[in-house]
């Protein structure tokens, strides 16, 4: 009884590596977006809203 040759392992490894890479990249990008980026945008928008309100108060006075 002969042992069957191992075929397709390189292709399977490449597909697995690419899939894991995309999954990890997507997870890290999503984490960055919601943990780091969104709070910075909220803080910046609040600052500019406050600045605009101050300028409007000075212009109307």
Curated annotation (Swiss-Prot):
Pathway(s) this gene product operates in, as recorded in its UniProt entry: Energy metabolism; oxidative phosphorylation
Can you supply one Gene Ontology CC term for this chain's record? mitochondrial inner membrane
Q: Which positions carry the propeptide annotation? A: 57-61
* Claim: Protein biosynthesis is one of the keywords in the record: no
Per the UniProt record, which residue ranges are transmembrane? 14-36
Q: What is its main location?
A: mitochondrion
Subcellular locations according to the entry = Mitochondrion inner membrane
Q: Which CDD domains match?
A: CcO_VIIa_fungal
Q: What is the organism lineage in this UniProt record?
A: Eukaryota, Fungi, Dikarya, Ascomycota, Saccharomycotina
Job of this protein: Component of the cytochrome c oxidase, the last enzyme in the mitochondrial electron transport chain which drives oxidative phosphorylation. The respiratory chain contains 3 multisubunit complexes succinate dehydrogenase (complex II, CII), ubiquinol-cytochrome c oxidoreductase (cytochrome b-c1 complex, complex III, CIII) and cytochrome c oxidase (complex IV, CIV), that cooperate to transfer electrons derived from NADH and succinate to molecular oxygen, creating an electrochemical gradient over the inner membrane that drives transmembrane transport and the ATP synthase.
GO biological process terms, semicolon-separated: mitochondrial electron transport, cytochrome c to oxygen
GO molecular function, a single term: cytochrome-c oxidase activity
Q: Which residues lie on this side of the membrane: Mitochondrial matrix?
A: 1-13
Name of the featured protein: Cytochrome c oxidase subunit 9, mitochondrial
Record's subunit section? Component of the cytochrome c oxidase (complex IV, CIV), a multisubunit enzyme composed of a catalytic core of 3 subunits and several supernumerary subunits. The complex exists as a monomer or a dimer and forms supercomplexes (SCs) in the inner mitochondrial membrane with ubiquinol-cytochrome c oxidoreductase (cytochrome b-c1 complex, complex III, CIII).
Protein family: Belongs to the fungal cytochrome c oxidase subunit 7a family.
């Amino acid at each position: 009884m002969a042992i069957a040759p191992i075929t397709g392992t390189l292709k399977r490894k490449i597909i697995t590596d690419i899939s894991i890479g995309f999954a990890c990249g997507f997870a890290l990008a999503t984490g960055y977006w919601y943990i780091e980026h969104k709070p910075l945008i909220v803080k910046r928008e609040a600052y500019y809203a406050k600045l605009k309100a101050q300028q409007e108060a000075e212009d109307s006075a």
